[in-house]
Design a protein with these regions (language model features):
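Conserved ABC ATPase signature
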Residues: 121, 146-150
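H-loop/switch region of ABC-family ATPase nucleotide-binding domains
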Residues: 206-207
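H-loop (His-switch) and adjacent beta-strand-loop-beta switch element
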Residues: 219-232
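ABC ATPase nucleotide-binding domains
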Residues: 243-269
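Conserved catalytic motifs of ABC-family nucleotide-binding domains
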Residues: 167
Length: 269
């Protein structure tokens, strides 16, 4: 008799506090292995805290039964969680203020550092892995270029390559298109599509339905430090839901699996 595979994550009755304030409460949530999902909501709703709960950057209030279970383990090691995930965020982008070639930035992903640590001797095999990931994302020609001379979109793809170099099963994109021009957005959304097609989980945090690639079927709406709704994107990416979520009149349009959001003004405004 086949046993059912444990979900990647299972959360039950998890509360995160900052000082005396609840900044996130999750009643029930499960994410299957290989599942793609988008977290959508306004600033301060709890989206980033939700991701930090998954990656153990924040811990929930203690319960006799741990509220967050990873692959069936009640007390997984931090090393196991880090090995599973790659994270691309604006915070990481802001830390890239060093004159290093892209190859060294990507190679640092093998050691969990930004660049190669001084006490580590990177091998030719390490550099080859880094170059392969840059090639895979269509930026192999940037391998020896100083990252400080690159466009925002190029840097963002270098950071994706840095996460891919340790072969994670899931990629978290936290507001990945912030600060990008249309070309950069196009390229990064293409990267997410590529990773999803390979069977990796894509977990996207965003304010904008435009960032949600067609391969993402499930949407989690976060509002007021809690899950407001969880379901199929075609059911939740509607004008009524978005208006309720963001608190202003909004309309949603869809085209071949892509969604776009626009303000809805009264006639004459």
């Amino acid at each position: 008799m086949a046993t059912q595979e444990a979900p990647l994550f299972k959360i039950h009755d998890a509360t995160v506090r900052r000082k005396e304030k609840v900044i996130l409460h999750v009643d029930d949530f499960e994410l299957a292995e290989g599942e793609n999902i988008a977290l959508l909501g306004p600033n301060g709703a709890g989206k980033s805290t939700f991701i930090q709960l998954l990656t153990r950057e924040v811990l929930p209030l203690h319960r006799d039964v741990p509220p967050v279970i990873f692959r069936g383990q009640e007390r997984p090691s931090l090393a196991d969680i880090k090995a599973c995930f790659g994270v691309v965020s604006n915070t990481m982008h802001d830390q890239v203020r060093v004159h290093l070639p892209a190859r060294d930035i990507v190679c640092g992903g093998l050691f969990g550092t930004l660049g190669i640590p001084r006490h580590v001797h990177a091998t030719e095999a390490d550099f080859k892995k880094a170059e392969e990931q840059l090639e895979r994302l269509g930026i192999g020609e940037l391998a020896n270029r100083d990252i400080m001379t690159m466009s925002t979109g190029q840097v963002r793809r270098v950071l994706v390559a840095r996460e891919l170099v340790h072969d994670p099963q899931a990629l978290i994109f936290d507001e990945p298109c912030t600060g990008l021009d249309p070309e950069g957005m196009y390229q990064l959304r293409g990267v997410m599509r590529q990773l999803a097609s390979e069977g990796r989980s894509v977990i996207l945090v965003t304010h904008y339905p435009e960032d949600i690639i067609p391969a993402i079927d499930r949407v989690l709406l976060i509002k007021d430090a809690a899950i407001y709704a969880d379901g199929k994107k075609e059911e939740l990416l509607t004008g009524d839901c978005m208006t309720e979520l963001f608190g202003v009149p909004l309309a949603v349009e869809s085209n071949h699996g892509w969604y776009s959001l626009r303000e809805k003004f009264d006639e004459g405004e």
